[in-house]
Amino acid sequence: MGSHVIDLVMLRNNFSTAEMRAIWNDEARITKQLAVEAALAQAEGELGLIPKEAAKKIAKVAKETTFDIAAIAEQVAVLKHSLMPTINALQAAAGDEGEFVHYGATTQDIVDTGTVLQLKDAYNIVLRDTQVVFEKLAKLAKHYQNVPMVGRTHGMQALPITFGYKLAIWVDEFGRHLERLHEIKERVFTGNINGAVGSYASFGPKGSEVERQTLAILDLNAPTIGWQSSRDRFSEYASVIGLISATLGKIGNEFYNLMRTEINEIEEPFSKGKIGSSTMPHKRNPAAFEGLASLTPPVLKSVALIHESMHVEHERDAMSWRQEWVALPEMNAYVSAQLAILANVLDGLQVKEAVMARNLEKQHGLLLSEKVMFEVGQKLGKQTAHHLVYECAMTSFEEERPFIDTLFEQAAIADTYARAEVEQWLDPTQYTGLCADKVDEVLAAWQTKGFLKEG
């Protein structure tokens, strides 16, 4: 039983996924650190820094032994050191060859590189699920490419768009997130094995080769120079996670608003027995949308904490280091939940096309004031037409009268245009501009880049 919301049995799946939690638990942390110790011993054995038999024994024990996490945790409390109890346990398990455990390395070498291994596993989940959401959005954008709806600016009705167009904007945004995830991989997944101050002194003249071989075994990149005091790699990863989360939160908030009773254009998936309120039986609340939107703020707080961790004193310290232990698991947990929520929502999203159509007529033609202005402006001039249409629109708005009636009270319109012609101007389905075309352009662009399959 835990005390953090990520670990609370009744709530944790709202804030994370089981798959992501498993990457950041005690067992995973120690397992990755032991993997680094095993790789270090193997590399040092191959390079002659330690006996080959000792290297084989250490690597075998590190990979195959089940260590007592509770006992290690007890020793952490006694020794006031997060890694030494693990080193001691590995040494004891390796017997006489254990004297060569952790040879030349410093704690931060092992912990940082272990964290990168954990982060790589987390990244793979984020990349996979971002791709899943991207593809689901693309499919829906194409499906609803020509479905007209109200476009809103400043929270108010503005001009007609299509639902597919709205979704295509998010498709394009997720495509850029995928590009960013692929772009940062080489920089972020870089280990660090270079000793107490990064000088390789404890490894002797083969220090750089020890690092390269150790990290090659772990399938990580080797740095040009140690990064114990340079935490920008984690900050870059965090920045991309923050961008992905911000898009996810924006979508959650947008869907939340579109599900409002007064708008009612979409609804999140509903299952029989789902309760919206303990006191109002009729409520069908946007719980998934709220959850999706609510997780962005804590992600961004974790991102900020990672950025603060770049402030490192001298060659390294533990103040900024510990902030990463808090922020990296949290941001990955929260964004994994967001991606899972949205993927599930998109699978069962109810799109109410009839309601979208009714909302297009809600202001009795005012939604097409721009169209009227440009049509009339061809004869009167755009600015003169703007003034004329503005006066008609305000009258229609304030008196709650059909826009076409107030327009035909103006001689400049009544004497020039047939009512049937103006009625055509006021058809919202005929004034969505290039919305449908843009859906195809977005999908084609990402197909060309190889992020999206054709069809």
Curated annotation (Swiss-Prot):
Fumarate binds at residues 106-107, 233, 278, 283-285. The active site is at 154 (proton donor/acceptor), 277 (proton donor/acceptor). It is an enzyme of class 4 (lyase). Pathway: Amino-acid biosynthesis; L-cysteine biosynthesis. GO terms for biological process: 'de novo' AMP biosynthetic process; cysteine biosynthetic process. GO terms for cellular component: cytosol. Keywords: Amino-acid biosynthesis, Cysteine biosynthesis, Lyase. It catalyses: N-acetyl-S-(2-succino)-L-cysteine = N-acetyl-L-cysteine + fumarate. The keyword Amino-acid biosynthesis applies. It holds the Pfam family ADSL_C. Is able to functionally complement a B.subtilis yxeK mutant in the ability to use 2SC as a sulfur source for growth. Belongs to the lyase 1 family. Catalyzes the cleavage of N-acetyl-S-(2-succino)cysteine into fumarate and N-acetylcysteine. Is involved in a S-(2-succino)cysteine (2SC) degradation pathway that allows the bacterium to recover cysteine from 2SC and to detoxify 2SC that may be a toxic metabolite. Can also perform the reverse reaction in vitro, and has minor activity against 2SC and other small molecule thiols. This is N-acetyl-S-(2-succino)cysteine lyase. The gene is purB.
